[in-house]
Amino acid sequence: EYGRSVIFQYYSVSKMADDCVRAYDDAYCETHGRRILMSGYYGFNNSGDEAILTTIYENICKMDKNIHITVLSRDPKETTQKYGFKDVVSRFDFFKVLYEIKKCDILLSGGGSLLQDTTSTRSLMYYLFIIEWAKIMRKKVMLYANGIGPVSRDHNRKMVKRVVSKADIITLREEDSKKELEAMGIPGDRLFVTADPVFTMSSVTEERAERLIFEAGIPSDKGLIGISVRNWKNDEDFIQKFADICDRIHDEFDKNIVFIVMHNPNDKDISECVMSMMKNKAYILDKNYSPKEIMGMIGKMDLILSMRLHTLIFATKQRVPIVGFAYDPKINSYLKLL
């Protein structure tokens, strides 16, 4: 468990917003005011990235309600309806994106693991292009609590170094990300390690969380073990082993197994595959919950086993014990912090 002093030092709202405020002050423009453009993996039904979006947005508004924020999203309509944001534009509308970059005073890129080529080189190039174009238009750029890597291809590493070096402020969510950028040739004195923004997010009330669990048809006769699983190399043997682990936990601890869908429909599909191979009955939370609702429900569980980083962070915030499955370096990096 984190000590209170560590929480206050690294994860308070004021700490997480402080770097942003520094960037805003530099970007201030008397004619247009402060205009912020947020770029990230938003609008893809990924609860971790949606938590990052809402937390950054809320933290900025707490610091200065007069700041105008525009969000780039895959699904502007859903992002607007779900969170009530005023200005959301499609990240795929090329000319609209360029127009928003031109209007803004500062670009916030992140957080999350945007700069990696495990997903695809195309995804990496998209985020680098946004940063590059902002600098061409002489805008201030801040990498906000980014997780860096893995970036495996030599050409991609050179591109990351070239583009990221142009950013005005670079903040990272863990020490390993700093080491990765240093290995690419970016000086360490330009890199600031903070933490994932989601550490400042609050959950729904206990009463609301209990109600959501009840409405999902999960019985309250036993304690709950939360499972967060994601696709991994289409390995059927992996699915069977995960099912065996869940059955063993169910039998040895006499707890109900509850699968937590963090990225719909991907996580739902793999969760249902694992459930189908289990000997015992399991349950699933697969509705379109908000990040705060998921965090609240996790707070009612006795243990979390997760391949998803933000499931682990939600549990840590709720003081629920965790077991992380390190399919990606970011999981290892997080577990080393605990």
Where are these regions (language model features)?
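Active-site anion-handling motifs in enzyme catalytic cores
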Residues: S12, C29-L338
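A short, well-ordered alpha-helix in the C-terminal region of glycosyltransferases
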Residues: E1-Y10, D18-R22
